[in-house]
Amino acid sequence: VEEKEFKGDVFFMGQDFGFNHANVILLLGFYENEIYILKELYVKGLETNEIINLAEDIFEKNVIMWCDSAEPDRIKAWQKAGFRAVGVSKEKNSITAQIDYLMGKKIIINPSCKNTIREIENWCWMKDKNSGEYIDIPTPINDDAMAALRYGIEYVRKI
């Protein structure tokens, strides 16, 4: 976590949809081998239209927003509101590939992104049930910002 001025010009957003779990939107900046987490919206228990209203005060609509493709109706609502929301295609082993990509980057988090900081500090790995060894799959608990981060880097990861 550090306060560091972002000097790049490549931006994407990542969104993990939620209601009981957090709905998270992250604004990401990309520069050389660094990923900047610049802004977050982290809310629970809100309808999509309520989240859109909050997001309109925080994020630019012209930045592509990579979203969980499992929720096409929500993506459509964001598009109708003027956001450039697009579903991320989920491929076999994509979570592992996204995490490998992230591990090769320096991630700089704006101190205002308190929920993202909390999640990344508490991120842990699953254990194999038989051997007890850690495996390369994160524990799916309190990982909403991490999912938004993974969605937000997916396009850049593939180029």
Q: Model-derived features: where do they sit?
A:
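Short hydrophobic/aromatic beta-strand or adjacent loop that forms the aromatic wall/cage
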Residues: 22-25, 150
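Short acidic, Gly/Ser-rich segments with clustered Asp/Glu that frequently serve as metal-coordination loops
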Residues: 13-23
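Acidic two-metal-ion nuclease catalytic site recognized across multiple nuclease folds
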Residues: 154-159
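Residue-level detector of short, conserved catalytic/binding motifs and their immediate flanks
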Residues: 23, 63, 146
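Charged alpha-helix within mobile-element recombinases
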Residues: 136-152
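Mg2+-dependent endonuclease catalytic cores in nucleic-acid-processing enzymes, primarily RNase H-like
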Residues: 26, 31-140
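Generic detector of well-ordered alpha-helical packing
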Residues: 17, 69, 144-145
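ATPase catalytic-site recognition across NTP-hydrolyzing enzymes
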Residues: 1-15
